[in-house]
UniProtKB/Swiss-Prot annotation:
Membrane topology: Peripheral membrane protein
Pfam families on file: OSCP
Family affiliation: Belongs to the ATPase delta chain family.
InterPro entries attached to this UniProt entry: ATP_synth_OSCP/delta_N_sf, ATPase_OSCP/dsu
Name under which the protein is recorded: ATP synthase subunit delta
Entry keyword set: ATP synthesis, Cell inner membrane, Cell membrane, CF(1), Hydrogen ion transport, Ion transport, Membrane, Transport
Species for this entry: Desulfatibacillum aliphaticivorans
Subunit structure: F-type ATPases have 2 components, F(1) - the catalytic core - and F(0) - the membrane proton channel. F(1) has five subunits: alpha(3), beta(3), gamma(1), delta(1), epsilon(1). F(0) has three main subunits: a(1), b(2) and c(10-14). The alpha and beta chains form an alternating ring which encloses part of the gamma chain. F(1) is attached to F(0) by a central stalk formed by the gamma and epsilon chains, while a peripheral stalk is formed by the delta and b chains.
Localization annotation: Cell inner membrane
Amino acid sequence: MKNLKVARRYAKALLLIGKEDGQAEVYREELEAFSSLFKANPDLEAAISNPIYEAKGRQALLRSVVEKSGVSAVTASYLLLLFDKGRIGFLDVITSEYKEMADELKGIARASVSAATELSNETIEKIRSGLGRLTGKEVVLTVSQDPALIGGIVTKIGDLVLDGSIRTQLLNLKETLKRSEAV
C-alpha cells in the first residue's frame, strides 16, 4: 500500500512536468520502454536495483543504459532520481500509475471484456459506445475469451465489474438454494 502511494507521487510528478512541457505522451512511451527493458532483462534490473552491489557501480550501469537508450533528458534525470531515492525497483508500478494518470488526463478509460464466445466487431463497438456513455470518456477495450463463463460477458472498467455471465448466475442460484436448505 505504501509502495503504491509512493509510486503515485513519483508518477504524478513526472506527469505534471509532461503537462507543463507538452511531452507527457513521450515520457509515457519512454517509461514503458524502460520498464519493458527491465522485464525482458531481469538480471539487468537486479544489477541496478539490488543494494548488495556497490551504489556507484549500479548508478554507472544505469547511466550507461539510459544514455544508450536515447531517452529524453527529463526521463533520464527522472530515472536517475528514482535510483538516487532508492525507488528504481518500483519502476513497473510507477509506469503503471503514470499510464493511468495520463489516460485520465486525455479522457481515456481502459476496460476489459471477457466473453464465453468470440464477439463480433459490431458487439464490441456497442459495448465500447455503451461504456463511453456510462463514463463520459473514450473507452479502449481489451477483449478476451473465457469459455468458463458458459455464456454472457464480464466487463471491468476501473473498479467497476459488470458480470452478466451464466457462470455467476449459476453460482448465485447455488448459494440461494443452499441458504433455503439451511432454513
